[in-house]
């Protein structure tokens, strides 16, 4: 839960998939602004990995790349913005957004933070590590995550979000190199991005059931906003 919070969606599978595709399309478009060739654009290459994992169609993927790179006209004008603050019960979080209207997004985020506390830039980021996050699954039964982390150049590793997966943590500048090296050491990369891990997370066990439910409800409301791409939370199980 500390690396990236994921909502326990109560919506239909179709609606959930639609939101995921919309967020992935935005990320591809903004990444493609730096070039449409994934071999020369690490951010785009990583976004494509995420899109393929989510079963985005080739047509949708190509359209997002062309739109972002401006190959069919003007390039898309999405802006990356982030917000910092606290969920109820002083649980720190960083919210990353992609938006075509910053004023609209900040106004809506302020409303969502009424049950928490929206902070100034830097008010929470100091309590997180800015890192590369690579989720990977073993390609064989004898794949060793510790050896793979050492050989591929990762800083650390821990259990991943998906069952049986490993989360490799890297320096931000090493993300692309490590995710390219992991297959040589027995792991298949399923997701890779620049993100955050908490330094001093709040323990969920220290919260009452009612308090934890309030935190979860707050985080789910944030995550469901159309402009929100990632939510990083200082909370451990």
Curated annotation (Swiss-Prot):
Q: Is Transcription there in the keyword field?
A: yes
Q: What is its main location?
A: cytoplasm
Entry's Gene Ontology BP terms: regulation of DNA-templated transcription
Question: Per its record, what are the GO molecular function terms?
Answer: DNA binding
Q: Where in the cell is it found?
A: Cytoplasm
**Gene Ontology terms: cellular component:** cytoplasm
Taxonomy, superkingdom: Bacteria
Name of this protein:
Probable transcriptional regulatory protein PP_2550
- The answer to whether keyword Glycoprotein applies is no
Family under the similarity heading: Belongs to the TACO1 family.
Instruction: Print the keywords alphabetically.
Output: Cytoplasm, DNA-binding, Transcription, Transcription regulation
